Amino acid sequence: MPSDDVYQTRDVQHFEHWSRSYEHSWMQRLIFNRVHRAALELATSLPPPVSVLDVGCGTGRLLRAAALRWPDARYLGVDPAQGMVAVAQRLTPGATIHRGVAESLPLPDASVDLIFSTMSSHHWRDPAAGVREIARVLRPGGHFILIDFGLPRPLAWLSLHGGGLPAATRRRLFSTAGLRIERQRTVAYPFILATLAAR
């Protein structure tokens, strides 16, 4: 269980405030909807999952879209902002939404078939720990789809956060965590990189 100071960062406070208007934000149309479509498209070649986790789930939009594709799966979400968790719980009643961070997921080992993390990893305090945690909760043969900025600092405002994860960094972090990259390509925009990996 993360300590309370994990939830006191500027990023988390920003998302607490944004949770009230997040569902209708221009960012949904400009970035998030495109990224979510790309994530689901990457997953089309995979076996239907029994369980799906979204790390940094926000208000649960990707979970709701995934549930239309795989209605029989079990859905889980994790987000550090309590406001986002509350909205996700209200709008995604079939899912179990936890308050938590990527670096300390509140889930058992080898418990999830498919894990998404979209436009979230640049907010993680420790990307290596986040990838290790994802590998820990992923079942053998399961898949992880990470979509986020693929350049260290593609936009000036990103310097307020941890920066993106370039392809070489992802290869190193994933390999160290025991994940094998199957596909990697840009999606939505040239500076957004999608990585599909297996355990």
Task: Indicate where each model-derived feature is located.
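Short N-terminal helix/helix-N-cap motif within the alpha/beta-hydrolase-1
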Residues: 125-129, 154
